[in-house]
Amino acid sequence: MKILFFSSFAHLVLQKNQERTSGGAELQVALLARELAGLGHDIVIAGGDVGQADRRILDGVLTRNAGKFHTGNLLEMLSAIPRVVQVLREERPEWVVVMGWTAWLFILWALRPFLGFKLDFTCSLDSEINGEYRREHPVFGRLFEFAVRHCDARHSITSDQEKVFRNRGMTATFYRYLLMPRSTPRSAGKSVDLLWVSRCQQLKRPHLFLDLAEAVPSARCQMICPCEDLALWESVKKRALTISNLEFIERVPYHQIQEYYDAAQIFVNTSTYEGFPNSFIQAGLAGTALLSLRVDPDGMIGLFHSGILAGDDMKELIKGAETMLSRPELLDEAQQGNARMVDEWLDNERNTHIFLEGLT
């Protein structure tokens, strides 16, 4: 089967790019593309133009430069359409897969009859299908939702998302995210109490982690926060540098990030919405407990006793941090529980085959 993944920066994950800190969907596209290529499928990633060479093969995956479709600039997006069409005509994929929200899903849907491919949408964030994206972006959001509904196939990454699709009259194949193989053995010691990792976006609510660090001054805190929303990032960085028990790090490439999870006792999530965070997976690989303000995909925190869910209550988040850090037996149980989640839920071969079943 020939599959083309339409993804702005997934090719940079395969390149092990030092400058770009990839988002979760980009990482998962790269991992899935590599697994599928290993199974003998013809896999292409059509990536945004960041100066990379065209037709480079990385880990068995052909990468194509599809122009500046990724910049967020409407004029550049429209100008990139001829190049995207050229790549699609040259590659002639059976399936085009889009993971995560983008107005390009509508454009690709419109191109389907002329170029002969089938279109799959894989949901990355819950907000892509629960109406939040449309409320934030009324025009592009409506086009995006129309395209989601009219795709030839859909995938969810949690059973919660599968239920949302079903409640909105759509079917979706439920598969779980893939694991990024470790490049180094897990370190023995844990020198950080509370770790927060995410790109700087409003929905990640980074200032709430700063509130937590200030509220628990005895905790050794670390924040890895690459810039995306510049104004928000500048306010976060300025404030973070005034907190004595917090180390602020601007960016860490994905192929180096696991060591930071390894060194942490507890991973903290303050987001309003996620899908299945890659950070939860990496925390599980590290034997790191979870402290989540709101996000709990498929009820995993209670199911595996992998940490504490605060019910979107900052007082409970602070209490949860203090409780786990003061009770070694509870912390150890949560760390073991999160590691067990990885063992029971995440198998690359199994989940890759489930993904493929959704394209039949």
Model-based region annotation:
Residues L31, V85, H137-R154:
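Membrane-proximal helix-turn-helix segments that form the acceptor-binding/catalytic region
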Residues V96-L115, C123:
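An aromatic- and histidine-rich active-site surface loop
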Residues E234-V252:
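Nucleotide-activated donor-binding/catalytic signature segment of Leloir-type glycosyltransferases, i.e.
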Residues V252, E259-A264:
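Short alpha-helical donor nucleotide-sugar binding micro-motif in glycosyltransferases
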Residues A289-L293:
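Short hydrophobic beta-strand element within catalytic cores of glycosyltransferases
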Residues F304-K315, T323-P328:
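Conserved acidic donor-binding segment of nucleotide-sugar-dependent glycosyltransferases
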